[in-house]
Amino acid sequence: MKFLLTAINAKFIHSNPAIYSLRAGVGEKLQPYVELAEFTINESLESILEGIWKRQPKVIGFSCYIWNWKLIREILTELPKILPDTEIWLGGPEVTYDGPGLLREFPQVTGIMVGEGEVTFREVLEQYLREAETAGQSEQQPESDSTEQQVADRRGTVAGKSVVERFGQI
């Protein structure tokens, strides 16, 4: 199971500390399940999509800010075409103000992480790992026949400790 945390930075020399903080916040035991990817707004959409596709994540999270939101919106439209079974999560200041509205606008998005990112991300990651363990899936998890229903059951915004309870709302 691979959860890809993705940052689209304003410049090549900039880095996104949020994704590093999220990975550090899950602790050493869970860090092997988290991969980081950084791109810039100056890269082409095709180049970014190729970089994501090469990593083949089961789940991808985007760190959304005012400087990258337009490009992320384009990625959200194209990503399901190349990785149809990859679940998509959003987080960051550009998306947390209207989670339900964004979920209606982008039905391909599984959920929006709100609240304390480190707490919320850890809970989301733990939930995916519990599901994989319950399903008896190895690290190279085969897709189950009910993936579409599992996504529908979990879709929604999440906040802090209530993340598992709130899967399925919206």
Which residue ranges define each predicted feature?
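Short acidic-aromatic active-site loops that bind/stabilize oxyanions
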Residues: 11-12, 65
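Short N-terminal binding/cap micro-motifs at the start of the first secondary-structure element
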Residues: 12-18
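Glycine-rich beta-alpha loop elements in corrinoid/cobalamin-binding modules
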Residues: 18, 22-25, 33-170
